[in-house]
Amino acid sequence: MKLIKPSFQIIEPTGYTIDDIYKSIELAGRCSHKSEDKITEISAKDFVGRMLNMKHLATCEFGTIYLYYKVDKPSTMVKEIIDFYKNNQYSKVECVNSYSDTYLERGMGRVYDIESEYFITTNLRVCLENNRQEYLTDALCEPTEYHYKRYTVKFICDRGILAEFTRHRRFSFMAESTRYCNYSKNKFNNQLTFIIPCWIKDLKEGNYYAYCEYHHAETDPCKEWFAACMNAEHVYTELIEKGWKPQEARTILPNSLKTELIMTGFDSDWQHFFKLRCAPNAHPQAKELADMLKDKFNK
């Protein structure tokens, strides 16, 4: 078995074109089956197409879309577009009004020309489910200082913390699936990987092959944890060898099993996440990751 510490990675988009959006979706979507090795320069569009054919639109939530409209006299169509995103709970709209130096004479008063700029942040699932994709061609843009930003983070944590983090329902989630991942395969080095709890201070990361490799007193409770993880790996492998499917053998896997979790949300969602998960009474393993991520966000 392999023991590692938890970690995270802030995933930056490769760009903001529709092809770049597809790449973000594929990267997140392949986390579930751990099929990232199938990603190529041209695989993203086909991957998204398959997801759409199977109605798996949840993956499209990871395709962040930034739109821009500049209007002086909004048409009925543009007004309808803006109103839709304003009322959509998964989108955010910022309006900036500018006043021109010239003015119009209207009766006895002077009324300055007003131009309104609309900065919209949404995701591809919203566009697809509401038949908005035809409006993307002209309005798609890179994020500006006025756009509400969305951020994507990949956590390497245990299954217990996965359950904690996915309670933040404002986010989009994609997690490594124990139903489909067969950890007895060469792809996973024929072993299970477990997360070292933060309260076990002297256990090093690495591969372990026998119970006796934990050199501590028999009364040390951490030795029991070590033995339980090793036993889980042994039983899991044995069940697979005897014909059980991964979705059946996974029933004996403990919370300490390593998993990968990708989360995408607005900056306000992450601030709420930090408020709860960095609190003194938060679960210590959740706080461990949240504190590290908050420090990175603040830099």
Model-derived regions: residue spans:
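Family-specific signature for flavin-dependent thymidylate synthase
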Residues: 1-299
